[in-house]
Amino acid sequence: LMMPVFIHDFGINGLWMSVFHSISAFCNAGFDILGSQDCLYPSLTGYSNNYIINIIIMFLIIAGGIGFFTWDDIYTHKFHIKRYRMQSKIILTTTALLIILPAVLFFLCNFKELPFGKRLILSLFQSVTPRTAGFNTADISSMTDSSQAVMILLMFIGGSPSSTAGGIKTTTFAVLLLNAFATFRSQEDVCAFGRRFDCQAIKNAATITMMYFILFFTGGIAISIYEGLPLSSCLYEAASAVCTVGLTLGITPKLHILSRFILILLMYLGRVGGDRKSTR
């Protein structure tokens, strides 16, 4: 579907470029080969006005990020959502919320000078891509501090179990959130969709989250101290590394060798985690 656009822009090479970016999006890699356009690292900013490219890339990112077991439920049960595994229900619900709510915030806080349509598609894309995809269609460094903070949270959460995405996973985030709600309401059991989470699942979720938080925060502070850069920017780069996203505020190429080594280490450690069953 992207071939006509890329062939129009790059000739016969557009065939290869459409295949490359499709795989990169579905696998949540975020690599692009468009650096010969306007600058060295444009990502998909040159296609921010192209709704076809935006929608297809977003669909592929989401498709690769919800997990293969979820797709198995969708394929097997179609629209009979009640028959889905509880994990699939949690994944689909959490994914929808993590796309819609941040997109609303981005729409309200950014791109105010743009027409409604472009503003909407930019907001949606920047809401989808932090979940370990790594593409961008806007200058992230020009977005508001609150938007960048939300993007850090989205990167931290990442995709879903059995998917191509990183982060602590949507199910882990959902378990912690449901546990907090249950605590506030003085409920002993943590439940979702009529089923109960066991204590070990909650412990696993807390452990995984704390491990990622320690790596992310320690790495960000270390880079900030060594480079003398603002902590917020360094935390953004650290979150992008440990959650294997690939987004940047533009400071990574300027970092010294030690800071780059820290980011490399965070990338490797970020892939060590527990894609463990969290429900019963």
What is each PLM-predicted segment?
Residues 1-280:
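Membrane-proximal intracellular helices of multi-pass ion channels
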